[in-house]
Structures are given as structure tokens and as C-alpha cells.
Amino acid sequence: MLVTDDRVDIWVGDQSPQETRHSASRITGIPEENVHLHLCHLGGGYGRNGNGPQAEQTILLANQNRGTPIHMLWTREEDFVSTTYRSMGVARLRAALDEDGWPVAMEVKTAMDEKAPGSTAGFDVASRYFAPNYRFSTHSVAFHIPVGTRRGVGAPAMNFYRESFMNELAHAAGMDPYQYRRELIARGDLPYKNDMIKALDMAAEMSDWGSPL
């Protein structure tokens, strides 16, 4: 990174270049049109290059040493303690099943960090598996820990909530988890449900589902 009196040049792997340009302009006082990002292929980001503090720290150092190129590289230990953490959250899912084991109602409650994308958690369950009745509620909680987008934003947590719950429902219904999921998808009216069924069938076939371990 190089900051002069009238220009900023940044070489970085960045998933949010506009935010980085804005930060550079704010810190240095140099107009955004004179902030130049040179995006580099620097390995995977997995979210950490989306809104982490690493670019701003380098901008601060370069601004204090104008005219001198600055290359900042964290050690692995610094990386763990100096950047943002994965957002936290908890979820409670409940369902009422009919006499055949199929859900007639589902309730999804989530509590996630106020900066986490928790508002979609309930919809994420409903967008996969059919039930005639749903109730969603999401609560934002301040954990006072710097968090950022990591490993697919909110998808990993929501997938864990949803699929763990589906396994529990299939077990309570005495059904095969794969067939249980397949039927619930088929009962829905999503325009892409056929693609979801094909993907599920393919996963079952590739994993040799149902064979002894």
C-alpha cells in the first residue's frame, strides 16, 4: 500500500472494494476518485476479506508514513486474535406432527449477533421443507465481540439448524431421513423444487445411501 499527498494505491485481495475505497478516503482525507485498488488473487477469502480490519490497519500505517510503501502481513497467531470472529447464534425449532409423521406446524426461534444475517433463518427452513403452518421470530443480541462474514455468511449455521432438525423429525416419524426430506420438498410449491429433488437424489446415489457402513 502506498499513500502520497494526493493518491492512494492499495494492492489487496478484497471482497468489498467499494468499502475499502471509502475507508481509505475517510482515513487519509484523499477523495475516493484518487483511491486506486489493485485487486490481487491472494487465495481464498471465505468472508474474511469482506469487512475485516486488515485493510484499515494498513491504511492507517501508510497514512502515517506517506511516500513509503507499506506491506502488512499478519502472523497466524495475530490472524486469530486481531481479526473479526464468526457470528454466534442459537436456535430453537419445534414442530407438530400428524399421525403419519408429517409436520403440520413448525416454529423457528433464533437469537443471533446483531450484525449477523439471522433474520432469514426462519425463512431458510420454510424455503426447503413444506409445512402448512409456520411461525418465525428472530432476536438480535449484542455479544460485544467483533464479528464478520465467515464461511458463507449465515448459511452454515442455518443449514446446521435446519438439517439437524430434519433428522430429528425423520427419527420421530420412524422414516428414512433421505426419503423424509424428499417428500417434504415434493409437497412444497417452490419453482425450483424439482432441481432440489434431483440434487438430493444425486447426493444419495453418490454416497451410496442406505448401504451398510
Residue ranges and their predicted role:
Residues 1-213:
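Structural alpha/beta core scaffold segments of enzyme domains
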